[in-house]
Every structure is written in structure tokens, then in C-alpha cells.
From Swiss-Prot:
GO terms for cellular component: fungal-type vacuole membrane; membrane. It is a multi-pass membrane protein. The keyword GTP-binding does not apply. Its main location: membrane. SUPFAM superfamilies: MFS general substrate transporter. The lineage of its organism: Eukaryota, Fungi, Dikarya, Ascomycota, Saccharomycotina. InterPro entries: MFS (IPR011701), MFS_trans_sf (IPR036259). GO terms for biological process: transmembrane transport. Residues 105-125, 210-229, 279-356, 408-428, 481-491, 545-555 are cytoplasmic. GO terms for molecular function: transmembrane transporter activity. The chain crosses the membrane at residues 84-104, 126-146, 189-209, 230-250, 258-278, 357-377, 387-407, 429-449, 460-480, 492-512, 524-544. This is Uncharacterized membrane protein YJL163C.
Amino acid sequence: MSNEDETTRLMSSDEMDYLLETAGINALEEIISQNDSTGINLDTNETAQDSSYDSIRRSPSILSVAKSVEGEHGRRKLLCLYGLVMIICIAESISMTATIPLVMDKVAEGISDENGHYDSVAVQTIVSSISSSTMMIAGAISIFMAGKWGELSDRIGRVRVFKYMSGIRVIGLLTHVFTLSSKMKYHKWAIVLTACIVPSFGGLFALVANGNSYVSDIVKTEHRMVTIGIMMSCIYATMGVGPMFGSFLVKWTHGNGFIPIYTSIAFVILALIICETIMVEPRHETQMAHSQSTYTKRREKLRSQSGSDDARNYQSVTYGKFQIMRLMDLLAPVKKLWLKPDSAGSLVPRHTVILLIVLDILFVCGTTSCMPALILFSTYEYKWHAVELGYFISILGIGRGVVLLVVSPTLLYTLKRIYQHLNHSIDKIDIFCIQFSMIVITLSLFVMIRFGEKTPTSMIIFALLQALSAFCSPTLQSGIIKYTSKKHTGEMFGAMALVRSCVMLVIPPILLKLYGSTVSVNPSLFMYIPFSTSIVAILLTFFLRIYKNPPLDGP
């Protein structure tokens, strides 16, 4: 596999905000360039070590992406990819909110007495435990499976991997709906294990990674960032509309929560049909054969290094070495975040990157990590069901998409006219965006702590304020990759994705556990943790320093 293919494969779903904002920036600059005769001047003396964020300013717009794909056949492949991704994402988002009330009903059925009475606090505690167990198991498996899917798609093709992912989704949804139906008695671990199937082996992380690989096969290098940004906008659109559509289905069927899941299964089956009939494999047979040959040689090399004559011991040692090497290979990109001193011996770049990583962790703690516990809080405090949850998630998802595609590019364009944009270091534009985002995150959590137990309107205000922080993630990521050369961009993204995955593996289960333990005393107590981390994040932003030396050569 070439270095270029490897870099593309390392792109993960954690780049979603960064890539989507890229698409918005280019769309805005295309409009400006058409209406303003002065346009945006390009610096022809920029070197190959320019940051990725600067490449956004010079890259083609969305309106010219179609020209980057050679021939009508290539453009049709892209349209098929966008359609397939949207169908799979809407299938996932439709059942997202309907599943939670079904799990709660199943738990209530399992712990109720002979008269049908049950303790609602006990239900919240058990559902919290189910959610945290599911997230931990699925998160641990998906970290390893994401890389495996990328390797597998190189060997057998992108379309076949899409087929496998769709098939796994059908199996996962069918088994999960069976465990929640009246045909099966309540069993906690049956619900947990069936809920782990889809996110562990065919979740959004793997879907986006395979989509990135598909794009890399048919789109020129200089146009890939914008093309992937368009794919991300398709994902955000469907992930925002899906929960609302699911709410309409539940309302239309008078509260039948199984209908959205059946609809999801139908959409996934449609995706399977599209893969079988319309989708065209972009990867050439010789490339797949080369990847298979490389994989076989690597396995043979591991066997030859085992040095064991005993057959059984030989197999176990080989397998153990192979898994250890895979684990080390998975963690290898993290070393890129520990930058070397520059030519003058300064450690400012290293300290800044570490601080940005810490801010990214705190950002995740204040946004994504608290959502599972917050959703359970809403079902307990406001008695929300699938319909209301669908509206809430749709507001949050659509709001983030609007901010990334409209508000963020406009804000950045305005700030670039006020402050100097730096290619080799974070600048005042980045610091302003990070500080603003952390402030609105803190305000959103304060609203929930202060008014969350009084009115459900606080959830809507929370969603709108959280949406305003959407450009924090791309700002942090673009700031980090300013300190490295383009040839290491994929590895840096991979390292950041791995750090985020580890955070999501730990923090949400902790918040769910805390919520389950305190729901009978103070349901909103868990919110103080993300609220505290957000305050710490605001304070840390004042320690960010602009690196004034010439651009780095990269780590």
C-alpha cells in the first residue's frame, strides 16, 4: 500500500467536523471570489511544508469538485457513494431515539412485581448500567476493528466491505429487536451484547473510514479534502434528519417504538441491494492483489520470526507476536504528538500541541461524552420518549451542520480580515474560536445545572449553545497539524482520533455510572464534571502561545 493510500485510510470519523468546515470554507470563498473582483490572493511562494489549514484556503471549491473526478463514470461513483452513506446513516439515526424507550420498557417489565409495579429509579440505574457496558465493550472492539476494516478493504475492495457492514447492521438490528420484543424474557446482558454488534463491527467510525478510502481511489489528491467534506455534510444532514423522521414514525403509529427499527432494517437492506447492483468497485484488481500479497508476506514474516519447533507453541507465539505488533502499530501515531525541539531548541511547539490535545479532551468531555447520561436524564426528569428525543437530537445535529457550513466559514473569513493568519503556528483567530467555543459549552452546561430540573426548555437552549461550539473541533485539529509537515498529516489525525476514542471509552461510562448512582438523590449531579472540565478548558486557553519562529520541518 502506498503512503498516500495509508494516509487516507488513517482518516477517521473524528475528522468529521474539520472536513465539513473545510467544505463550508471553500464554498464561501468561491462565492466571494465570484462577487469580489479582488478575491482572495494566493501566495505562490508557499512551501511544501505549509499547514493543512492553509491548504484549505488554496484548495478548490465545492462547485469545482465535479471537475476533479475524471469522466462521467467517476462522478456517478461519487453520487452512488453519497447516496449509500446517506441511506446507512439515516438507518442508524432513525432507530437511535426509539431504542432507548424500548430498553427502558424491557427493563421495567423485567423488574416489575406481580401487579406490574416497578421502581422508576431502579429502571434508570439499570439502563445506565446497560448503556455504559455497551459503550465500553463496543468502544474497545471498534478501536481495533476500524484498522482491520481498512486493511480488509485494501485486500478485497471497498464495495465488499460496505456489503459486510450492511449485513452486520441487519444482523445486529434483528437480534437487538428480538431481545427487546415480548417473545424473549428480560436479560440484561442479552441486551448489552446485541446492542454492541453494530457499533463494534460496522459502526460510523468504520463507515466513514471506508468512505474516505473509496474517495481516495477516484478523486485527485488536491480535491480529496473538499470531496470528503461533502460526504461529511451528507452524514450530518441525514444524522440530523433521521431522529426527527423516527419521531414522526413513532407518533404516526401511536407510540410503536419498533416501527423505526423495522424501517432502519429496510433501509439497510436497500443499502445491500445498492452495493450489489449499482455500486462499482473503484479499487483495481492489481491493487487488491498487491495488498493481499503484502498481507501474506507480513504474516509469513511473523511465522518465520517465531523460532519455535513445537507446532502448538509455534502457533501461539506467532499469534501473540502478531497481536502485539498490531497493538504497537495502532499506538505508533501517538508518538507524533510528542514533537521534537525545533532547530533553536525551543519546546514551545511541543507544549502547545500537548495543550491543544488536553483542550480537545476537555472539549469532548463537555460535549459528546455527557450526551448518553443527559438523554437518560431527560427520560427521567421530563418523561421524554422517542418523539421528544428525536426532536432534541435533530436540533443538535442540524444546528452543528448549519454552524459548520454557514456560521463558521463566515466567522473565519471575518476574523482573517482582522487578525493575521499563521501557517506554522496557532494564531489569534484559533485562540478566539477555541475560547468562544469553551465559553458557550460552559454556558450550556450551566443552563442545565441551573434550570435542568425545572423546565425542558433548558434542553433546547443547551442544544443551541452546544451547536455554536461545533467549530472548536476543527480549530483544534487544524491548530495541531500546523506543527507538522503534510506527509505526517494522516498520522497526526490518526493519533488525535485514537486519543478521542480512548476518552469516549472512559468518560461516558463514568458519567453514566455516576448518574445511575445519584439519580434518586440529585439527577443532575453528573453535569458538574463536564461543567468543571469546561471551566478548566477556558483557563487553559490563556496559556496558548503563538510560535513566532519560522515554520517547522515537521516532527
